[in-house]
Amino acid sequence: VTIRRATARDAPDAADVWLRSFAAALPSVVRPRSDDDVRNYFREVVVPLRETWVADAESGIVGVMVLHDGELSQLYLAPDWRGRGLGDRFVALAKERNPGGLGLWAFQVNGPAQRFYERHGFVAVTYTDGSGNEEREPDVRYEWRP
């Protein structure tokens, strides 16, 4: 599996990974945007305007990570690719690209993500009731400092 910068032609597959991963990892979280809105967002914003990376396997795109302004804003893997070390590789790359530190948000219902980030040295610094995010889902702010 190769991790590389996303190109415009990766946007549809990266969006599909996001959609499948979100549905599998966060079944109780209500998304405020339709599948088509998510695909458009990846095509018009995420890939062209953010530092977007994809994990490219023989079968196609199996992971996506988005960095922006010192934030690890998105990290999603195809459900059948969890537990294979891709997330570890993405986080190592994120730290390499942001050696001064990183921040991120995770939903409180996503215990596996919280454990994953804590294992990688991220520390929970703020818990919210979700009123500040589109999903209105309680979340937690994590920070990593070298």
Regions inferred by a protein language model and the residue ranges of each:
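Conserved acetyl-CoA pyrophosphate-binding loop and the N-cap/start of the following alpha-helix
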Residues: 80-81, 85-93
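Conserved GNAT-fold acetyl-CoA-binding loop/helix
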Residues: 15-44
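Conserved GNAT acetyl-CoA-binding A-motif
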Residues: 97-109
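A short beta-loop-alpha structural element at the N-terminal edge
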Residues: 2-16
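Conserved beta-strand in the GNAT
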Residues: 54, 60-76
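Conserved active-site tyrosine of GNAT-family acetyltransferases
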Residues: 117, 122
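A short, internal acetyl-CoA/4′-phosphopantetheine-binding micro-motif in the GNAT/acyltransferase core
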Residues: 71-82, 106-107
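A short helix-loop-beta-strand connector motif used in the catalytic cores of GNAT acetyltransferases and
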Residues: 43-54, 71
